[in-house]
Amino acid sequence: MRSRARAHVATLFLSTVVASALLATGGGAAHARTPSPTSSIGLPSSVDGGAWASGHLQGTAIDRRRGHMYFSFTNLLVKTDLAGRPIGSVTGLTGHLGDLDFNSADGRVYGSLEYKAAQAFYVAIFDGSRITRMNMDARTTDVLSTVHLREVVRDYTADMNGDGVFDGDTGNTPDHRYGCSGIDGVAFGPDLHGRGGGRLTVAYGVYSNTARTDNDHQVLLQYDVRDWRKYERPLSEDALHTSGPASPGGKFFAYTGNTTYGVQNLEYDGDSGNWLMAVYKGRKASFPNYGLYVLDGSKPARRGEVKGQPRPEYGRIVSLLPGGLHHEPSGVYGYESGGQYGLVSLDDGRYYVAEAGTVDSGGTTLQTGRAVLHRWTGAVPNPFAVRGTAR
């Protein structure tokens, strides 16, 4: 693992040089982007996250007060200014870093972090103020702490068919309660019980499997992170810790139909009070398989049936917003849009919707990411419209 990490850091160093050169010189036509101007009264129409030898773009977060954007590239975190200039990066992650969100209460960036082979799932907490240079190792610097999520482990490792064998990281099995493949989407927002108060919401990944009926919900866990400092531990991939809350503060279910790896990006919109869930589309013919679902923030969670379970089960059900496209046979509402690679609400009807891509650099394929400013229109099928420089 260590030799692999050293080789990866060396590759990322090359990527840093390439990305900086692209930003400085404009690069080739296939990937050149002019950084959008910023001002004291506005935000740019787009923020370029660079090009990297990494996994693909997973999520984005913005620190508006300091003028920083964060990009998760699966095994790499990149910090830029709002002109897209790299400020720093965090390497050394061999797990899967997913969606991100910025916590305005403590000024840190929270993300989902999976180690499926080790059956370990964490919230990764990055101290952005300490990310000051490129290629900072997550294991040997003080930029990252982690909190273990025991509830996710319980559902991920559940032996649903009772054969005494856990089948591992595969969707082709009856194992994994609710089809849980781990975690991905994360966002800060109100308590879904309707009692107020900011919570960190963590969404399950869910395997695509058209043969089972117990995987048709998005599963959301909520945590009060104000006392999480007592759980936080540095990342040690050679000795993964289990320090974290024994259970979530709430567990909620949204009936959408099965998707491919669950909620990729979760975002709370302070303007509408609704929650957005961007997903990779599912494959079940009995569902519409939309790319975006919206939770109705005006309706507190209610007790109801968690449909399709092996035995009757009841839990806290959250409602989809009755708007957009509607699939009458299933009763599911939703939209067709982007957001699967990054979604940031500015809480005033505007969003940064991320785009992912690749470029070739001397025979090496680099992953790219860009956050593009949109406004919410509510139109169907795509409720987002591109707009220019923000006010």
Enumerate the predicted regions with their spans.
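Beta-strand-rich domains and repeat architectures in extracellular enzymes and scaffolds
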Residues: P44-N75, H96-D99, D184, D191
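Blade-loop segments of beta-propeller domains
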Residues: A83-F121
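Residue-level detector of Asp-centered blade-edge/turn motifs that repeat once per structural unit
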Residues: I62-R66, F102-D106, P190-G196, D269-S272, ...
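Surface-exposed loop and turn segments in beta-propeller and other repeat-based domains
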Residues: P37-G50, I131-I183, V225-T260, G304-S337, ...
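Beta-propeller domains
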Residues: S40, G50, D63-L93, P245, ...
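Beta-propeller blade signature
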Residues: A120-D142, T213-S236, P288-P312, T365-A390
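Signature of short aromatic-glycine-proline-rich micro-motifs recurring in repeat-based ectodomains
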Residues: S54-G59, H96-L97, K116-A118, D159-P190, ...
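Secretory targeting and sorting signals
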Residues: M1-R33
